[in-house]
Design a protein with these regions (language model features):
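Aromatic/His-enriched, Gly/Pro-containing loop or helix-boundary segments
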Residues: 79-93, 100-113, 156
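Secondary-structure transition/capping motifs at alpha-helix termini
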Residues: 1, 96-100, 124-131
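N-terminal beta1-alpha1-beta2 module of alpha/beta enzyme domains
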Residues: 1-96
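A broadly tuned preference for mixed-charge, low-complexity surface segments
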Residues: 53-67, 102-112, 156-157, 162
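Flexible, glycine-rich active-site loops centered on histidine and acidic residues
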Residues: 12-33, 108-174
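Hydrophobic faces of well-ordered beta-strands that scaffold small-molecule active sites
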Residues: 7-11, 55-57, 100-106, 129-135
């Protein structure tokens, strides 16, 4: 099969822990996501055995406003929140696997290019080249507030910042 005919498969683990758990009373009791890394270790090993190419960890630094413009329902019912920073998990998973890649999300709006380059260079080394960056400009006002801003930066300004970010960050990531 040629490269042109190859399909690459990724598992999106962004919201794995809460998508529908809010519908099941008591579903948080004993849930493995918060107590240990074994849950993700098993997923990584299983995905690699299944010849998947990538585990994708989408992320945000704030809650969504998908339910009536408020984060109340999200927080009260645990819908896609809370979430852990998966950065520390990547080296653990990479040591347990040999082929599968990992994609980690980092915002160009709230992170500094030096920090981003430093993190991804380190992850590139410890994963032996199996790391990808899901660069986002962020979208939620609660994320802005969590980073110390009263309002979300305007859409155009976020994308101008992202362009500048890539210009200064990308050359250091090679």
């Amino acid at each position: 099969m040629s490269e042109k005919d190859t399909i690459h498969l990724a598992a999106d683990l962004s919201f794995l822990h809460t998508d529908f758990l809010w519908r099941m009373p008591g579903s948080w009791a004993g849930y493995p996501y918060y107590s240990s890394s074994e849950f993700y270790e098993e997923i990584a090993k299983t995905a690699e055995r299944g010849r998947m190419d990538l585990l994708f960890f989408g992320d945000t630094g704030g809650t969504s406003e998908d339910f009536g413009g408020s984060h109340d329902a999200v927080v009260t019912n645990g819908v896609k929140w809370p979430r852990h920073d998966m950065t520390p998990m990547i080296p653990i998973l990479a040591r347990m696997t040999k082929q599968i890649g990992y994609a980690l999300t980092m915002s160009t709006t709230y992170h500094h290019p030096f920090h981003c380059a430093r993190v991804f260079n380190a992850l590139d080394h410890v994963t032996k080249g199996r790391i990808a960056w899901n660069a986002v400009t962020s979208a939620y006002k609660w994320e802005a507030m969590n980073w110390g801003f009263d309002v979300m930066m305007e859409h155009g300004e976020r994308y101008r910042r992202a362009q500048e970010f890539f210009g200064s960050c990308w050359p250091t990531m090679g």
